[in-house]
Regions:
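Solvent-exposed soluble domains appended to multi-pass membrane proteins
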Residues: 162-469
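Membrane-interface segments at or immediately adjacent to transmembrane helices
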Residues: 94-190
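Residues that form generic nucleotide/phosphate-binding pockets
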Residues: 45, 130, 134, 154, ...
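Low-complexity, intrinsically disordered short peptide segments enriched in small/polar/basic residues
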Residues: 83-89, 156, 165, 409
Length: 469
């Protein structure tokens, strides 16, 4: 019995250390609540080398456990106890190294100029703690702890967790809007709208916001010459499910964001525009069976939803998908342009209802390497920059087509992101030299708006507003 109990304890400790160590290596932090909340999307990150590494590590752990507590006659008790002692000392040493070198930003002390810090604790204890937090978020009125509520209060945010909508805002503006709207007495021309909710982009590496990596996003930079560039604009939530749903509906999504609360009564942008005669469609590159985006965006009110398979079948002929989960960014934009071309005739004659289109790509996702058809960045050897440069190339294809299309004079184009870039190791090495960068999942995002009237300001300071505003 004691041997079995020892085996269970050792298994838990080893697996916790392995899991926390892997997460620490890639993300610079132990497993986070958002990681567990999005565990169903793990396949986005499982490349062949990572699967091989995970398999090798798991095999090693099982072998070590058998050597320490196994009953095999070929291993004597003295050797097993000696190995156990070595593992114990190594574990203590590793933990000391982690505590000394792996400091994280404390959520209670977030400050863009002087953040507080706190050390990492025991791998097993912290894994248990984060698991408790995730289960607590499933319970009504327990999504936030007292510490988190007090932190919100420090920033002037009052949260009543007993309310149906704890963060409801009773008004949009208390003073005149900063940007005027066409028309008088609330009337306006019904422009089409295309919104690119790009996967995980932070503006700090992109032109026109930054010149740290010249030529990284030349097409977005070119777009900015015609569009209004918004600065100091931050994400209000994360990750993808929360970002897509939260921005479309202007709210904070419950828990991981993958579950849809049908009983809640709220209207989103497609619902509001429908009352003014708009039709809405959402386009994304993944296959619907690999994600919950279909269900989420249906609840957000979109009339039609096109996943990677639908777009591939309709606009890419027999071309095979370049990603195991769907279309590459190159294929996705090619298919979307094909969709726009198919409706050009009605646009020219004005025989159609105004539309609201929203797009979501996948290749710029944290820890994902570019597909084989990607266009690589020639400045710095980094797969992170490759994915951003490749996505910019696809946007350039869209923008060049758009400027010569019937949509140019009747369609608003908004380029932004679902949330900022996650602070994974490979991104941090690119930006940690910037004095205002902090390894937290909140950062400045790109926001550029093209309006056919060409009357928007060249630049606009959002003054630290977020995507919920």
């Amino acid at each position: 019995v004691l041997r079995a109990m020892a085996g269970i304890v050792l298994s838990l400790v080893l697996m916790a250390c392995f899991l926390q160590g892997a997460h620490l290596f890639y993300a610079g932090d132990y497993v986070l609540p958002i990681s567990l909340a999005n565990a169903a999307q793990l396949d986005l990150l499982l490349t062949a080398p990572r699967v091989a590494a995970l398999t090798a590590a798991f095999t090693f752990l099982v072998t070590i456990e058998w050597l320490v507590i196994g009953r095999g006659a070929i291993i004597n008790a003295r050797f097993r106890w000696g190995l156990a002692l070595v593992l114990l000392i190594s574990g203590i040493g590793l933990q000391a190294f982690v505590i000394k070198n792996s400091l994280r930003v404390s959520p209670a002390e977030i400050d863009l100029t002087s953040p507080g810090r706190q050390v990492l604790g025991s791998p097993l204890a912290e894994l248990i703690d984060v698991t408790k937090k995730v289960f607590r978020e499933h319970k009504k009125n327990q999504a936030l702890t007292e510490i988190e509520l007090n932190t919100a209060a420090r920033f002037g945010i009052s949260i009543d967790q007993n309310a149906q909508f704890p963060l409801i805002k009773p008004n949009i503006y208390t003073s005149p809007p900063p940007l005027e709207v066409d028309g008088e007495s609330g009337s306006f021309r019904k422009y089409n709208v295309i919104v690119l909710l790009s996967e995980g982009l932070s503006s700090r590496v992109m032109q026109p916001y930054s010149q740290d990596y010249p030529g990284l996003t030349p097409n977005v930079d070119d777009f900015s010459r015609t569009a209004m560039t918004v600065d100091n604009y931050f994400n209000h939530t994360f990750s993808t499910y929360r970002g897509l749903h939260g921005q479309t509906c202007s709210f904070y999504v419950y828990f991981g964001g993958g579950s849809v609360i049908d009983s809640a009564s709220y209207s989103c942008i497609p619902d509001i525009l429908r009352r003014h005669g708009y039709v809405s469609s959402f386009f994304y590159s993944q296959y619907n069976e690999r994600t919950q985006i279909d269900e989420i965006m249906q609840r957000a009110g979109f009339d039609s939803i096109y996943d990677g398979k639908h777009l591939g079948d309709d606009y890419l002929s027999s071309e095979a998908a370049n990603l195991e989960i769907g279309l590459s960014d190159q294929q996705f934009m090619k298919a979307f342009i094909g969709h726009l071309k198919s409706a050009e005739t009605t646009q020219k004659h004005g025989d159609n209802d105004p539309f609201y289109f929203s797009l979501y790509n996948i290749e710029t996702h944290a820890l994902r390497h570019p597909a084989e058809d990607a266009k690589r960045y020639q400045g710095v050897n980094s797969y992170v920059l490759d994915t951003i440069h490749n996505y910019d190339d696809t946007f350039g294809q869209f923008w060049r087509y758009f400027q010569s299309s019937p949509y140019y004079d009747n369609t608003i184009v908004i380029f932004t992101a679902d949330h900022s870039r996650f602070y994974d190791r490979d991104f941090r090495v690119l930006v940690e030299h910037q004095s205002d960068y902090r390894p937290i999942f909140v950062d400045r995002m790109p926001l550029l708006i093209y309006h056919p009237s060409r009357e928007l300001a060249k630049n606009f300071d959002a003054n630290y507003a977020s995507s919920i505003d």
